[in-house]
Amino acid sequence: MQALKLVADHGELSSNNATTAASSAFVVQSGLLYLACSSEKKSGHISVCNTVAEAGIGSFHVEKGNGFLYRYGHPAHAKVTAVTKGATTVMTIDHVDTKIQVGDYVTMTGSSVGTYNSTVAHVEVTAISDPQSYNAYTKTITVDADTSSLADFTGTAQISKSVIARLAPETSDGCTMHVHEVNLA
């Protein structure tokens, strides 16, 4: 067995009955989760998705008292160099080769204007422009975030693909799942 290195501890998802539970949004760092199902309750199903409405799509069963290694995605990041404010937000990125796609959800970090970090937090990508000679080969990413009332963006920041984990207990006895993002050591 290959050793695992902890990248991030995303906490635990727990339900005392058959009600589903969802995590807060988290940035995809390695794309590999180690899930440990507590032996105190019953088994459960786990999925990683963009919204709580997608629960159960591509879910995996984890037996109580067992662990499960789950490759759920790949990291995707882009450096933001400019922002056009509005009811939707258009961000200019510094490199045309990003793995962020329309339909992904992203979170901004590192903005010197802190309200951008909290406003562009797990929001949907609605459009991506193609770099062409007429636009100096720049690429823009449009997200569903209203930044019209924020101060002007200055400096740089980063957007990263973000997701949520969703737990569906197997029975009305509930389930507790510990969620750890790992990398192979």
Please report, for each region that a protein language model flagged, where it lies by residue:
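Short, intrinsically disordered N-terminal pre-domain segments
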Residues: M1-S24, T147, D173-A185
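Extracellular and analogous surface-interaction loops
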Residues: A21-Q29, D94-K99
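Asparagine-centered strand-capping/turn motif at beta-strand->loop junctions
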Residues: Q29-K41, P169-T171
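Short beta-strand/loop motifs in extracellular/secreted proteins, especially
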Residues: G31, K41-I46, D104, C175
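Beta-strand-rich, repetitive solenoid scaffolds
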Residues: A36, S47, L69-G73, E124-I128
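Short, surface-exposed beta-strand/strand-loop-strand elements in extracellular ectodomains
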Residues: A36-G58
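Loop/turn positions that initiate beta-strands
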Residues: G65-N66, G103
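Small/polar beta-strand repeat architecture
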Residues: H74-V90, D94-V102, T107-H180, L184
